[in-house]
Amino acid sequence: MANLRKTHPLLKIANDALVDLPTPSNISAWWNFGSLLGLCLISQILTGLFLAMHYTSDISTAFSSVAHICRDVNYGWLIRNLHANGASFFFICLYLHIARGLYYGSYLYKETWNIGVVLFLLVMMTAFVGYVLPWGQMSFWGATVITNLLSAVPYVGNSLVQWIWGGFSVDNATLTRFFAFHFLFPFVVAGATMIHLLFLHETGSNNPVGLNSDADKIPFHPYFSYKDLLGFIIMLTALTMLALFYPNLLGDPDNFTPANPMVTPPHIKPEWYFLFAYAILRSIPNKLGGVLALLSSILVLMVVPILHTSKQRGLTFRPASQLLFWILVADMLVLTWIGGMPVEHPYIIIGQVASVLYFSLFLVLNPLVGWLENKMMNW
């Protein structure tokens, strides 16, 4: 009699994705981040659910309800710290996962890659609306500044902003709908993740050498299930340590002050994981131009597969392209630093140079160097 996990309609799906999935034998730890992102999502949904049981989405009580969670709810402080810092780990894993895809040419699985970019945008939206909920100073002013960017849309801009606000300023209606969105989006992300996996399993995983690995596949379980488990333990340990020892390390001190529409904080800035995009937004001295650059900084990922010129898939055997990849990593770090700095000399020009370099790497330098490498190898 055939094994139940191979015949039962529901178990068969899980079996084909987690047990009998043929996996390239040589995938490295860089392939762990997909499952780590799944773990982050589950962790965020669970901690978020418990926070939602005690949170009130009303401007008069939102801030004090968060304080109440931290002071009076059993282990509320822990749940909140895990949720807030879990978001940071979510983005760390996301950036590493995307970097792996760029380095090893995983973007050539176009459907999987494009759904991944959509997932990235969804997670960014979720994090943004979630940041507004505690109704601290930076929550309020962050919401005001970022939603205001929509007013740059020609003709319908102002109407669009007021429609999203539910009034003439960020107010109670805004907070209520942002809470509704923040509750809904993670489930949309979970659904999109299933589609992401569906397309990935149509082709199978890529591998570090970028060659067809059909001749050398091994079952996912037990080999990679245990390898993933090690990643889980490392990440959960790091998250727990951050949440217990340095819970406010990555937060903004302004969020310990309740939102006050009458007082603008000296430096409005988002959480660290949005700083690179914020730096690109600020580097263009025009509202609409900045908004377009902000959108393009993420959507540029969608054109990477189209601009792939090399005859090889990954960068494993392409030193010149490797150099460009690490320049991109350094550029992202510079942009992240600039995003947290005030708008003054020399930060303005550094941000502008870094922004130009960011787009040049994706749109010009990488395709050009890929083509040059082909020429050098007489391909």
Curated annotation (Swiss-Prot):
It comes from the Eukaryota. The chain crosses the membrane at residues 33-53, 77-98, 113-133, 178-198, 226-246, 288-308, 320-340, 347-367. Its main location: mitochondrion. A ubiquinone binds at residue 201. GO terms for molecular function: metal ion binding; ubiquinol-cytochrome-c reductase activity. GO terms for cellular component: mitochondrial inner membrane; respiratory chain complex III. Its cofactor is heme b. PROSITE patterns: CYTB_CTER (PS51003), CYTB_NTER (PS51002). Binds 2 heme b groups non-covalently. Keywords: Electron transport, Heme, Iron, Membrane, Metal-binding, Mitochondrion, Mitochondrion inner membrane, Respiratory chain, Transmembrane, Transmembrane helix, Transport, Ubiquinone. It is a multi-pass membrane protein. GO terms for biological process: mitochondrial electron transport, ubiquinol to cytochrome c. The keyword Cell cycle does not apply. It is found in: Mitochondrion inner membrane. It holds the Pfam family Cytochrome_B. Heme b b562 binds at residues 83, 182. Heme b b566 binds at residues 97, 196. Component of the ubiquinol-cytochrome c reductase complex (complex III or cytochrome b-c1 complex) that is part of the mitochondrial respiratory chain. The b-c1 complex mediates electron transfer from ubiquinol to cytochrome c. Contributes to the generation of a proton gradient across the mitochondrial membrane that is then used for ATP synthesis. Belongs to the cytochrome b family. The cytochrome bc1 complex contains 3 respiratory subunits (MT-CYB, CYC1 and UQCRFS1), 2 core proteins (UQCRC1 and UQCRC2) and probably 6 low-molecular weight proteins. Heme 1 (or BL or b562) is low-potential and absorbs at about 562 nm, and heme 2 (or BH or b566) is high-potential and absorbs at about 566 nm. This is Cytochrome b. It comes from Anguilla reinhardtii (Speckled longfin eel). The gene is mt-cyb.
